[in-house]
Amino acid sequence: MGDWSALGKLLDKVQAYSTAGGKVWLSVLFIFRILLLGTAVESAWGDEQSAFRCNTQQPGCENVCYDKSFPISHVRFWVLQIIFVSVPTLLYLAHVFYVMRKEEKLNKKEEELKVAQTDGVNVEMHLKQIEIKKFKYGIEEHGKVKMRGGLLRTYIISILFKSVFEVAFLLIQWYIYGFSLSAVYTCKRDPCPHQVDCFLSRPTEKTIFIIFMLVVSLVSLALNIIELFYVFFKGVKDRVKGKSDPYHATTGPLSPSKDCGSPKYAYFNGCSSPTAPLSPMSPPGYKLVTGDRNNSSCRNYNKQASEQNWANYSAEQNRMGQAGSTISNSHAQPFDFPDDNQNSKKLAAGHELQPLAIVDQRPSSRASSRASSRPRPDDLEI
């Protein structure tokens, strides 16, 4: 019972990893081939060599004539056919077991990370990597599996090899036996003294089984072809619908906005903030931030920003007691951003930097006033 339960679990897992055509193919394989081969066909060919008679008494003549007529028994030929046809499926099952093993490891690691997460450890990146690996192997929630990636390629290759083996064995059977058996076979081979006639037992019954196995092989081949086209067109349909990797958007690089010319700063209107050239009468080291000049949607905002910057700078200097005429004159002419790059270059090159004189407005003390009015020996006479 243990072996049957293990086989049942294996078949259940294969059903989960197969398409509808694959499930039908497995049913045909196990019911109409293996089961029929082990019951009815074996009994029909049980007395094949013993019932093969020739009209001669020469020892060894019947054996050589049987070997010439049937190089390999039909039963053993069909056993080899089932083995070769099942090998691609076994390779696919090996890949399934590999995915199952990966699923167990990933689930165990995910549980450990979730336990660590409850203790306050930041494991979001590791959990994300586990989710990406599960998607890569086709593992989904609640044990569901979607055929994709390497598993899908293995499945397609197995279908191709099964189809090739089916066609090859059909051609070999047609070349060796044909698809029917005759009641009398003529043989002329040593040590037979002359040409002898040999007789086959139950030729009609065996012909019926041969035709039945031929039909089963053709049905299996048709199922493989239908399944191959189904998988191919389903993949094309998924691509047409635009189904992509859901983790691609989160793991891929983010593209910058079209309205932003520089990734340094981003304002509410989508304008960037490259450094503007120095204006006339601006102090050394002072820079204004403006938007992209080539972007017409940002020009009004850049003018307002520059005017506000100058107003703030004027207020700050006035609070410090600096003469406001210079600032007011420079502020009276706000920045303009013409579309012509040549005019902007002339404007930037036509003005030189003029440092502002810092005047100390603190009241002088009495000592200093006396010292300033007292003549000193090194003073010059005018």
UniProtKB/Swiss-Prot annotation:
Residues 45-76, 177-207 are extracellular. Residues 244-382 are annotated as: Interaction with NOV. Residues 264-382 are annotated as: Interaction with UBQLN4. Keywords: Acetylation, Cell junction, Cell membrane, Disulfide bond, Endoplasmic reticulum, Gap junction, Isopeptide bond, Membrane, Phosphoprotein, S-nitrosylation, Transmembrane, Transmembrane helix, Ubl conjugation. One of its GO terms (molecular function) is gap junction hemi-channel activity. The modification S-nitrosocysteine is found at residue 271. GO terms for cellular component: apical plasma membrane; cell junction; connexin complex; endoplasmic reticulum; intercalated disc; mitochondrion; plasma membrane. Residues 2-23, 98-155, 229-382 are cytoplasmic. The modification Phosphotyrosine is found at residue 247. It is a multi-pass membrane protein. There is a cross-link at residues 144, 237 (Glycyl lysine isopeptide (Lys-Gly) (interchain with G-Cter in SUMO)). Disulfide bonds join 54-192, 187-198. Residues 362-374 have a biased composition (Low complexity). The chain crosses the membrane at residues 24-44, 77-97, 156-176, 208-228. The modification Phosphothreonine is found at residues 275, 326. Phosphorylation at Ser-325, Ser-328 and Ser-330 by CK1 modulates gap junction assembly. Phosphorylated at Ser-368 by PRKCG; phosphorylation induces disassembly of gap junction plaques and inhibition of gap junction activity. Phosphorylation at Ser-368 by PRKCD triggers its internalization into small vesicles leading to proteasome-mediated degradation. Sumoylated with SUMO1, SUMO2 and SUMO3, which may regulate the level of functional Cx43 gap junctions at the plasma membrane. May be desumoylated by SENP1 or SENP2. The modification Phosphoserine is found at residues 5, 255, 257, 262, 306, 314, 325, 328, 330, 344, 365, 368-369, 373. One of its GO terms (biological process) is regulation of apoptotic process. Residues 317-332 have a biased composition (Polar residues). Residues 317-382 are annotated as: Disordered. Belongs to the connexin family. Alpha-type (group II) subfamily. Gap junction protein that acts as a regulator of bladder capacity. A gap junction consists of a cluster of closely packed pairs of transmembrane channels, the connexons, through which materials of low MW diffuse from one cell to a neighboring cell. May play a critical role in the physiology of hearing by participating in the recycling of potassium to the cochlear endolymph. Negative regulator of bladder functional capacity: acts by enhancing intercellular electrical and chemical transmission, thus sensitizing bladder muscles to cholinergic neural stimuli and causing them to contract. A connexon is composed of a hexamer of connexins. Interacts with SGSM3. Interacts with RIC1/CIP150. Interacts with CNST and CSNK1D. Interacts (via C-terminus) with TJP1. Interacts (via C-terminus) with SRC (via SH3 domain). Interacts (not ubiquitinated) with UBQLN4 (via UBA domain). Interacts with NOV. Interacts with TMEM65. Interacts with ANK3/ANKG and PKP2. This is Gap junction alpha-1 protein. The gene is GJA1.
